[in-house]
Amino acid sequence: MTQFITHKWLAALGLASSIAAFPALAAKDVVVAVGSNFTTLDPYDANDTLSQAVAKSFYQGLFGLDKDMKVKNVLAEGYTVSDDGLTYTITLRQGVKFQDGADFNAAAVKANLDRASNPDNHLKRYNLYKNIAKTEVVDPATVKITLKQPFSAFINILAHPATAMISPQALEKYGKDIGFHPVGTGPYQLETWNQTDFVKVKKFAGYWQQGLPKLDSITWRPVTDNNTRAAMLQTGEAQFAFPIPYEQAALLAKNKNLELVASPSIMQRYISMNVTQKPFDNPKVREALNYAINRQALVKVAFAGYATPATGVVPPSIAYAQSYQPWPYDPAKARELLKEAGYPDGFSTTLWSSHNHSTAQKVLQFTQQQLAQIGVKARITAMDAGQRAAEVEGKGQKESGVRMFYTGWSASTGEADWALSPLFASQNWPPTQFNTAFYSNKQVDSDLAAALKTNDPQEKTRLYKEAQDIIWKESPWIPLVVEKLVSAHSKNLTGFWIMPDTGFSFDDADLK
């Protein structure tokens, strides 16, 4: 039964008020303050990293990613791939139970992948699984997955946070409402979900990893106000908070009871330019705008130093990423290129943003000022999620109003395909996926497709390098920065950290 708990947040002088009717803290109850709300507890139907991160309380996949974004076994013990790259045979961990008592086995894997790969279910993460032709039960501890075409990053897809193993009994019982009734093999099970306020999970006594979990419960609490989220740590109302607003970082670092952590990420921030529209169809214009942005200054102004200038179109910690010399800040060169392109007096355009939080606003204002110095007048619009879905993600090339678009991308598979194909492949123009530059290059398309058909690391490296070299030269983006992830936690909380894709890792979390 869902409990309903109400309270009113108050914040004054940087201190959060105490919370009325807040759930009583257990001996090892951890409160995690996060920056936005959750959309669903069904990982297959969530487009946001936060919902998938919280779902890791209940769910696990066959594989996962460690804090260095390397694939690790979780519910799988190993796998083999056929010579033609089409068939994956996976050996499963035995003796694992779902939280409703059902057995985890090959039939459970089949039920989940059949659901995920069926377009009739209209799941938001269908694109990850559309290459699955069939999933077969070999025996209770072995499953065989056949693909429609070779896809060498398939194990990374199975390691993606979306690929969770849900109890088949729960899928049958709850159907489309499974997002409200999570049942997995994870260390915690749902206790309460107040959809406007918090998700509370409690220790699953039947968890298969001996000695875990160490916490009694975790309360995931959305707190959209930056100051309130930081203040909850100061007052002890939360033991972990993310993201920490950059302007609050120095203050929290001085608190002897807290630890501030700036960790590496795979979150790249960039501005795409619609290369099918004037003036962005001209390569010299795109080069000019890249020369116009002082990325070192942007790091200081918008990110308080918690970012690094982008050195490519794929963050360095992603497999097969290529690094280049960052674009130098040279407004004189930018003006010269605009003149050569036929725009001696600059031009007017629009700059949209996929987010409207304070950091995005700072990036937009900084970029607007930088562009103005070379004669480019940009009218800025910071969008909410609904506007973004309708105006950017939902419209094709002919009807799209996108010209310049500030956004970010986190390739949660840890592999170059998911960092490149959704953003640069010709087939992935909106509304299919997120190629908001409407970029198209036949050689890039060929390289990306070929890289998925080979299991030879050297050949994959060559293909991904060639694709990135072309993209970097043709400049459909203004690559800006790779963010650092700033979190803070009570010093008596251990084993709880932020993953490079902005998800959470808390398998070994403990409260001393």
Curated annotation (Swiss-Prot):
InterPro entries tied to this protein: Peptide/Ni-bd, SBP_5, SBP_5_dom
Keyword annotations from UniProtKB, A to Z: Periplasm, Signal, Transport
GO cellular component terms, A-Z: ATP-binding cassette (ABC) transporter complex; outer membrane-bounded periplasmic space
Locations listed in the record: Periplasm
Gene3D superfamilies from the UniProt entry: Dipeptide-binding Protein, Domain 1, Dipeptide-binding Protein, Domain 3, Periplasmic binding protein-like II
Signal peptide coordinates: 1-26
Domain of life: Bacteria
GO process terms (BP): dipeptide transport
Gene Ontology MF, one: peptide transmembrane transporter activity
Chief location: periplasm
CDD domains on file: PBP2_Ylib_like
Function field: Part of the ABC transporter complex GsiABCD involved in glutathione import. Binds glutathione.
Oligomeric and partner information: The complex is composed of two ATP-binding proteins (GsiA), two transmembrane proteins (GsiC and GsiD) and a solute-binding protein (GsiB).
Family, similarity comment: Belongs to the bacterial solute-binding protein 5 family.
NCBIfam families assigned to the protein according to its UniProt record, in alphabetical order: PRK15413.1
Protein's recorded name: Glutathione-binding protein GsiB
Organism (species): Salmonella typhimurium (strain LT2 / SGSC1412 / ATCC 700720)
